[in-house]
């Protein structure tokens, strides 16, 4: 019998079948096996029992079972191993027909049997190898299903689990092109170790060198073309934009491919997928709620997104998460959301996840309209995650499209209520790292959000592209971005936002295009790093000094605090405060110089205190007659020269504001 999963051994909780209050064997006795908590002597309560042969095959036998003089079960006089398919009750009768023992549930008494049953309940009760199709196995499963052989599916194959709560343990692969669809999995179901692999090996590109340098020339990218499931991604129309000219260079068999082996969880609630892996793999949660992708085991993505939560019809998705794990490659984004809303509790999003070499963005919230409805997302979490070397962007968390703005938002807030890029997305965003993006490191839009602890490193394009309004950014580090010197700013903020703590340590010079900071409507504070002031464009640069401030100079004879007003000049300092050594190191003397720009010459006018250790002040005089409006404040005087520098005079403003002129000396 090949369709039996008999794995519960029929045995007495005692070593041999004995009478319940003695060590005497029940010689020539009989055993009846039935359902738990029933009388197994009644045929209506009995369950099938089998002899298990050495080759693992099973032969069903009739009851009662016979006990020999030694207290062991025999069949036709031979010792045999008897098994059944489930927990059971047991009644034992002696040779005279008297009941000597009754056990309502053997599992309560036998730790070994309990372990077998517990293992079955928490792992599987049905093996795929015992059934011709996955649907047959799913229909037979009670509480679990073991995928113990490779299963070849056809695209669109649908498996209906009938609402059962199952643990599906995968020890083998699902192989096929297209979607394998799981429906009606009960709330609390768990799929562990699933491995999806395409039948077809696609043509892939990898626009980087062996030493991980980006390739941007179309011909160089096409030169990397090869068939592989493990090293690259299938080119898409996005690559036609990223690498101009590549479309005409690619051979026909590398265009329009759509090779993905996708496990689709359709319209389920509370299903978790753990330790998923695969080659050309995808995992699509369509119309799902409170579902989780947990600890992805580095699946290599196919043509579609690797992990997708899509709720374009029905209710907005809620409670859907990517938690932990890592993915590689894929032609689209590693983790993406379409029309999800986590509500005020921010129930949903990405936590503790790593994306490597995504063909588009590492983590993406879709923007704009898809079909006839919005694909935008609200109230999600994006925390503690890393995106490494994506072909496009690291984290793309926008809602409105930028390149082709829509006139309205079907199924969403109208433009009249929330203008372009000003939706109340309310995402919780904290502790994200992007390294080496060929596009933008971190991008988003929206209004009224708080974003903290973002680090972007070594990106070819902008470090941060923020179409945000009235939002607060705290602890943002942009390090060595716009390395390809694109027509891009290292940081761009469109609306009136506040940036508190902007670290720019290690910024590479970008002598070609773009500013270091372009935030024409924002207030920025806490900038650190070697930043060229001419590359800063902000509405307000606020650096409040709390307590004592000290400017230290190491290895130089001077310390300086320099001032620059960009409305006056983006390249020249408007004023400065210097401290210079009098004499050499250790002289114990210095002088202080206060300067101002004049005639487009910085430091043209200066006041010096203690120059040459004189213990006095060097005051500049106006070189010609001073006009009355030269002096600004009362109780002040302004020295000036008159009569071809032969008469030294002073313009004095008395405490009452009256002006008088005094002759100090005639030469």
Curated annotation (Swiss-Prot):
It is an enzyme of class 3 (hydrolase). Coiled coil: none annotated. Its EC number is 3.2.1.-. GO terms for molecular function: endo-1,3-alpha-L-rhamnosidase activity. It is found in: Virion. The keyword Hydrolase applies. The active site is at residues 360, 393, 396. One of its GO terms (biological process) is symbiont entry into host cell via disruption of host cell envelope. One of its GO terms (cellular component) is virus tail, fiber. Changing residue 393 to N: Complete loss of hydrolysis of O-antigen oligosaccharides. The keyword Ligase does not apply. InterPro entries: Autotransporter_pectin_lyase_C, P22_tailspike_C, P22_tailspike_N, P22_tailspike_N_sf, Pectin_lyase_fold/virulence. Keywords: Degradation of host cell envelope components during virus entry, Degradation of host lipopolysaccharides during virus entry, Glycosidase, Host-virus interaction, Hydrolase, Late protein, Viral attachment to host adhesion receptor, Viral attachment to host cell, Viral tail fiber protein, Viral tail protein, Virion, Virus entry into host cell. Pfam families: Head_binding, PhageP22-tail. Its main location: virion. Structural component of the short non-contractile tail. The tail comprises six spikes that mediate primary attachment to the host cell lipopolysaccharides (LPS) and display endorhamnosidase enzymatic activity, hydrolyzing the alpha-1,3-O-glycosidic linkage between rhamnose and galactose of the O-antigen polysaccharide. Digestion of the LPS brings the capsid near the cell outer membrane. Belongs to the P22likevirus tail fiber protein family. The interdigitation of the polypeptide chains at the C-termini is important to protrimer formation in the folding pathway and to thermostability of the mature protein. Homotrimer. Interacts with the host O-antigen lipopolysaccharides; this interaction induces cleavage of host O-antigen. Interacts with tail hub protein gp10; this interaction anchors 6 fibers onto the tail hub hexamer. This is Tail spike protein. It comes from Salmonella phage P22 (Bacteriophage P22).
